[in-house]
Structure formats: structure tokens, C-alpha cells
Amino acid sequence: MTLAYIPSPTISQFSIGPVTIHFYALCILLGIVLAVWMTTVHWKRYGGNFDQILDITLVAVPSGIIGARIYHIITTPERFFGPTGDWVEMFRIWNGGLGIWGGVLLGALAAWAWCRHKHYPMALLGDAVAPGLLVAQAVGRLGNWFNQELYGAPTTLPWGLKLNMEGSAIGHSEQCYDGATCPTGTLFHPTFLYEMIWNLIGAALIVFLGSKIMKKLKAGSLFAIYIMWYTVGRTWIEALRIDFAHEFLGVRINVWVSMAVFVLGVVAFIVIQQMGKSTELLAEKLRTVTEIELSLVEDGETGLPTAKANLTKTKDEITANDGSSVSYADDQSDNK
């Protein structure tokens, strides 16, 4: 008889009148709120403000969710298009199914496009968002707990996960390897908990590095560290999971993807350290852009002379190190 285990929730949703609210969605929303808050704190230290992060969030988050869903659909097409598939399930995100790499890719592309449009240093944004992104992913994993999904192999460890076979939870089957049903009461590795702990440790590590040795790192280094940290954790945690997944050479596709992205993270870190721009220089650029925006908001077109005057003090440095012209005060006047 098992004396210690992690219980599963008895519900995965609740209703307020005609509206059904899923805990999976609430976990994602809470993660987004925490990520925005943490990103804003770090972004302000670089010279930006909350309004800039809010604008980026409104562009990047919807794009990231769409990208994450597309990645899941591509990697598990039989759920939606197979003989037993249902294409309507593509739109039922609350039932689970978001692929982190699709979210990071499309969300990052959207953020990059907005930063380029507004002349914000994308490398600084990556560093600012890195710890918050890990915290958001950690909180989001709680949604898997409520859905009783993505658990690992059977275990006898005292922190094993015991599935709830009653109530309104989505996961009702104690599946072992190859879809076979395990004996009732089987405990499973709580992979959601492993990833939560791993991500929170990574977030703390990145915050520590950012506060202690940031002057030794080029802008963008913290985001590269995020990529390396997350992919290492995802590789070993993914290997514990027993839910259905496509494989290549006997290894889950997501493991291959994580290893490939880890290599890209290492390469990115090396390139950034060799060819990247200093955090202080890009922070000065961000402060200047922020001053321009504030001048335009407060003074309108009459604020352009002041904005251009503020820009003069960093024009030579930014032009030399950013490889682009710094005559964007006029552009900002069009975007106010």
C-alpha cells in the first residue's frame, strides 16, 4: 500500500453561469501576468517603461499562443486529422496541447518585428523576458496537473502522481507504455512538477547572473542561457514521458528538437559574446528612444527638437555599434 503520493485534482474546470472556466487557461493567464511583471521590472532597469512592454505583449502573446498550437498540431496530426481525429479539436486549446517551441518562435518573430518598428533593442528584450518566460512556463505546467496529462512512467517514489479516476478531470486513463492500462492506483512520475522546479531554478539563476555578471556578458546572453537551460531540462524530462509521441530512431521528436535547439543556444551564446553589443550601449539607446517617445507624447510635434537633441548624445555610439542610421526621431513622430 502506497503511503505517500501527490494527488490529482478532482476537477479541471468550473462554471459561472453559462461560462465554463478551465484551470488550464487560468494557469496560462497567470503565467503571462507574472512574465509581463518580471519583464517590466528588468526592462525598466535598461531604460524602458511598462507601456512598451504592454505593447510588445499584445503583439507577442497572441502570436506565441497561435505558434504553440500550430506546433502541437504539426507534431500530433492524428489527433486532428487521423481516422479518429476531429479537426474541431484544433480550436479547443483548453483541452491541452501547446508546443513551447512554436510559441517561442512565432512570439519572438512578432516581438522582433515590433521592436524593429519601434527601434527597441531586441537583444535587451530577450534578456529582460528570459527569467519571466521560465516562470510563466513553470506556472503553465500546473495546467497539465489539472488536466491529468503529460505524466511520466510508473514509479514507486513517494512523490509519485496518483491519477484521479472520478470527477470532471480530463485525464481518466492510467496509461502505461504503448497505451496499455496500468493497474489501478499506479503512481507516475510527475513530470509537470519536475519541469516546474527546473524552470524556477533556471529563472533564479538567470536573475542572479543578470545582477552579478551582466557587465561581462553581451546583450542577448541571458536569453541564450535560457535556451540552453530549458532545453537541457526538457530533454531529460521529455524522456520520462509515456504519452503517445512520434519518434525518430526510437527517440521522441521533442527530444531531438530540444537537443537541436540546445546546440543553437550554445552557438548563439558564443556568437553573442564574440560579436554582440554591450548591454550598457543598448541600454543607452533604449533610454534615448524612451525619451523620444515621452517627448512626443507630452509635446507632440513641438517635442521633436527636444527629442532630436536628446538623441544627439548617443548618435555616434549607436550608429557605430548598431549598424543603422539613428534618424528615427521622425519615424517615431509618425507612430505616436
From Swiss-Prot:
Entry GO MF terms: phosphatidylglycerol-prolipoprotein diacylglyceryl transferase activity
Organism of this sequence: Bifidobacterium adolescentis (strain ATCC 15703 / DSM 20083 / NCTC 11814 / E194a)
Family: Belongs to the Lgt family.
Protein name: Phosphatidylglycerol--prolipoprotein diacylglyceryl transferase
Enzyme Commission identifier(s): 2.5.1.145
The UniProt record lists the keyword Protein transport: no
Domain of life: Bacteria
Keyword Cytoplasm: no
Name of the gene this protein is made from: lgt
NCBIfam families for the chain: lgt
Main location: membrane
